[in-house]
Swiss-Prot record:
One GO MF term: carbohydrate derivative binding
Pathway recorded for this protein: Carbohydrate biosynthesis; D-glycero-D-manno-heptose 7-phosphate biosynthesis; D-glycero-alpha-D-manno-heptose 7-phosphate and D-glycero-beta-D-manno-heptose 7-phosphate from sedoheptulose 7-phosphate: step 1/1; Bacterial outer membrane biogenesis; LPS core biosynthesis
Enzyme class: isomerase
Record GO biological process: D-glycero-D-manno-heptose 7-phosphate biosynthetic process; lipopolysaccharide core region biosynthetic process
Native source species: Pasteurella multocida (strain Pm70)
Subcellular location: Cytoplasm
Family membership: Belongs to the SIS family. GmhA subfamily.
Gene behind the chain: gmhA
Pfam families noted in UniProt: SIS_2
Extent of the signal sequence: none
Subunit-structure text: Homotetramer.
Additional record remark: The reaction produces a racemic mixture of D-glycero-alpha-D-manno-heptose 7-phosphate and D-glycero-beta-D-manno-heptose 7-phosphate.
Stretches assigned to the SIS domain: 37-194
Identification of the protein by name: Phosphoheptose isomerase
Length: 194
């Protein structure tokens, strides 16, 4: 009944993943992002993560695995997903949704922290504002984008881009794979100092 559609979906996902893997620069950027986060943790910094929709869930997933665990039992790492409903609804109502993440960064972010922002289009105004606020605070920025990187192209310290121009779900599938690899590398790196 749907076997061909199922196979086509999986084949498309594999094609997007293989294209991402075959760009050696992506491997270097993932390593660079993991080291940037690990260095922040070693110096007392934290990660603030944010995204919209499915990317918001990925931001929460990343923070949860940093504070909780990924594969190994180890001390928790300082991370906050900007997901507090009272904060989001307050700022959305009083200032506008484009400021929900930047207001939090202004309040909680410190020099040496890392902003981890996800946007499949690279054009999410609230993520762009968060990046601006993070830069003003002296924070480092890791951006996970898709397509051509949108307005986020070139403005982060590290941008990991999935150059897929179809539906956003394919981009998000690579983003979560990258998040899991980042977790593995961060755990490897932090184990050197624990």
């Amino acid at each position: 009944m749907y076997l061909e559609q199922i196979k086509a979906e999986l084949n498309e996902a594999a094609t997007v993943l293989n294209k991402f893997i075959n760009d050696e620069n992506n491997m270097k950027l993932i390593q660079q992002a993991a080291l940037l986060i690990s260095d922040s943790f070693k110096q007392g910094g934290k990660v603030l993560s944010c995204g919209n929709g499915g990317s918001h869930c990925d931001a929460m997933h990343f923070a949860e695995e940093l504070t909780g665990r990924y594969r190994e039992n180890r001390p928790g790492y300082p991370a906050i997903a900007i997901s507090d409903v009272s904060h989001l609804s307050c700022v959305s109502n009083d200032f506008g949704y484009e400021y929900v993440f930047s207001r939090y960064v202004e309040a909680v972010g410190q020099k040496g922290d890392v902003l981890f922002g996800l946007s499949t289009s690279g054009n999410s105004k609230n993520i762009l504002n968060a990046i601006k606020a993070a830069k003003e605070k002296g924070m480092k920025v890791i951006a996970m984008t898709g397509k051509d990187g949108g307005q986020m192209a070139g403005i982060a310290d590290v941008e990991i881009r999935v150059p897929h121009f179809g539906y956003a779900d394919r981009i998000q599938e690579i983003h979560i794979k990258v998040i899991h690899i980042l977790m593995m590398l961060i755990e490897f790196e932090m184990a050197k100092t624990e």
